[in-house]
Every structure is written in C-alpha cells, then in structure tokens.
A protein has these predicted regions:
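Acidic active-site catalytic centers that drive phospho-/nucleotidyl reactions
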Residues: 49, 53, 72, 90-93, ...
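N-terminal subdomain of lithium-sensitive/metallo-dependent phosphomonoesterases centered on the IMPase/IPPase/PAP
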Residues: 1-92, 263, 270-272
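Short loop/edge segments at beta-strand edges and connector loops
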Residues: 71-73, 143, 186, 231
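Residue-level signal for inorganic ion chemistry
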Residues: 27, 49, 60, 95, ...
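Oxyanion/phosphate-interacting regions
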Residues: 1-13, 18, 193-272
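Glycine-rich active-site/cofactor-binding loop and its immediate structural neighborhood
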Residues: 83-121
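Residue-level detector of anion-binding/catalytic polar loops
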Residues: 66-68, 181, 201, 226
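Acidic beta-strand-loop-alpha-helix segment within the catalytic core
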Residues: 109-193, 239-272
C-alpha cells in the first residue's frame, strides 16, 4: 500500500467517526420536535433523517469525490459505479424510536472497500457512545477496546429477534423465545455493537438492509464477532454497485453463540 493509500485509509476512518458525532449532534437538535411522514413502504422518515443524510453526503463528497455514497433515504446513490470505496449511510437507525421521542437510535456510517467492511462508526447521541472500527485496527467504544464474549447460549442469554414475522414465527425463533431473554432496542446497528461489547449474545434479523449493517459490521468483526446470512453464507462482499441490495436475513453473535444458533437454524430449516 502506497503512502497516499495509507493516508486515505486513515482519513476515511477518522471522517466516519467525525461525521457520526456531527450527525448525532444534529439529531439531538431535532429530537422531540421532528416532523414525521411515512414512506411508500409504510416505514417512517423524519426531517432529521433527510437533513442528516444530506449533511453527511455533502461532507463525504467534498473529502472523497471519487468515492460512491448510498443512503437509506430519498434513493441516495452517487459516485462512480465501480468505486473502490463505497460509503453506506443510515442517518437515523431506529427512526421509530426517534420519532416517538424514545432513546435507542443511532447515526450509522459504514465504508466498504471492494464490497468488504472497511471502516464503520455508530454513534448513540443519548448515551454518547461512539462505536468505531477499521479493518485490521480493532474496534472501540469511545476509548475502550472491544471484544465479544465467548459465552454459549444459555437460559440467561440476551438475544434480539426482529418482529413482526409476516409469514409466521419460524420454529427456531419460537424455541429461542422460550429459552432465552429477548431484548429489542430498535436500532440494528446498535444491537450489533452490543454484541461486539458482550452485552447481547445473539442478533437475528430476517429483514436487514445494507445500511442497517454496514456501519456496525466492522465493529462486530474487529471485536471478534461473526456476521453471516442466516443460512451461514457470507454477508460480504456486497457486489451490488448501487443501493438496490435487497433486505436479507442475518445472524450475528460471538463465535460460540453464532455457531450454536446457526446449527439450530439449519436443523429447523432441514426438518420443515
């Protein structure tokens, strides 16, 4: 890697964290006073989502004009189709919480390099927790290095499972809800980061979008966690050049809990 490439690497890592912090401060300016509307798919969007995304995208384009940018809101997709670096923005991950004046939302910024998680920052402006990571450089919560637990799934495990299940609750999820303790925080990015810090033991999300995952994926992976599609196949690299990457079912955990859960998902699927 050339000196110029190393400089760009460090600058992207720093910019992701800096923009997550700035986006979080802007989110607080709208908190409890945001204007809420519904998107065609029925999900919510606020004026904060749009304002934060616009601000972040402008700063990224100014700093790295050759990078591509995609975002959750308003069909954002800019930059070269085959760019080496692709920024993935979720300006308010947890809009349902944010719109109701509840905590449990974050600003999530991910950077993919050749479709693989490269750098990420997830900021919770209520707790002032900044989760950040860069490939090969570790993961951090503010100034504290992160490692997942290695605890197996047990009766006391805390797991997160997205609801509702439009086609009925799969048998493995029914079993988990009987055996484990459910926590659903409303921000997929934060939940993956909670696995990275050892707070959550498992996350199953049957409808995760790329912008839900891209900012937190480097944090989880650099902390020693595992993130795959629910069938165990790799989540990355992402080969879709634009924003039309479809929602997917994902499984995230520490190495032990992920292996246990994947075996249960596989057994349940085979037996159906």
């Amino acid at each position: 890697m050339s000196a110029d490439e190393r400089f760009g690497t460090a600058e992207r890592e720093r910019l992701a964290s800096d923009l997550a912090l700035r986006g979080g401060r802007l989110a607080l300016e709208y908190f409890h006073r945001a204007h809420v509307t519904s998107k065609p798919d029925g999900s919510l969007v606020t004026d904060a989502d749009l304002a934060i995304q616009e601000r972040l995208a402008a700063e990224i384009a100014r700093a790295f004009p050759d990078d591509a940018i995609i975002g959750e809101e308003a069909g954002l997709s800019t930059g070269p189709r085959h760019a080496l670096y692709r920024w993935v923005l979720d300006p308010v991950d947890g809009t349902n919480n944010f719109a109701r004046g509840l905590p449990g939302f974050s600003v999530s910024i991910g950077v993919l390099r050749n479709g693989q998680p490269f750098a990420g920052a997830v900021y919770d402006p209520i707790t002032r927790w900044l989760f950040a990571a860069c490939a090969g450089r570790g993961a951090w919560l503010n100034d504290r290095p992160l490692r997942t637990s290695r605890a197996p799934l047990s009766a006391g495990s805390l797991i997160s499972v997205r609801t509702p299940f439009e086609d009925g609750v799969p048998p493995f999820a029914e079993d988990w809800l009987r055996r484990h303790r459910l926590r659903r925080f409303g921000s997929t990015a934060l939940q993956l980061c909670y696995v990275a810090m050892g707070g959550l033991d498992l996350v199953y999300d049957h409808r995760a979008s790329l912008w839900d995952l891209a900012g937190a994926a480097p944090v989880l992976l650099e902390a020693g966690g595992v993130l795959t599609l629910a069938d165990g196949s790799p989540m990355f690299p992402v080969t879709t050049a634009r924003r039309d990457h479809p929602p997917v079912a994902v499984l995230a955990g520490n190495p032990t809990s992920h292996a246990q859960a994947l075996a249960e998902v596989t057994a349940s699927t085979v037996s159906r």
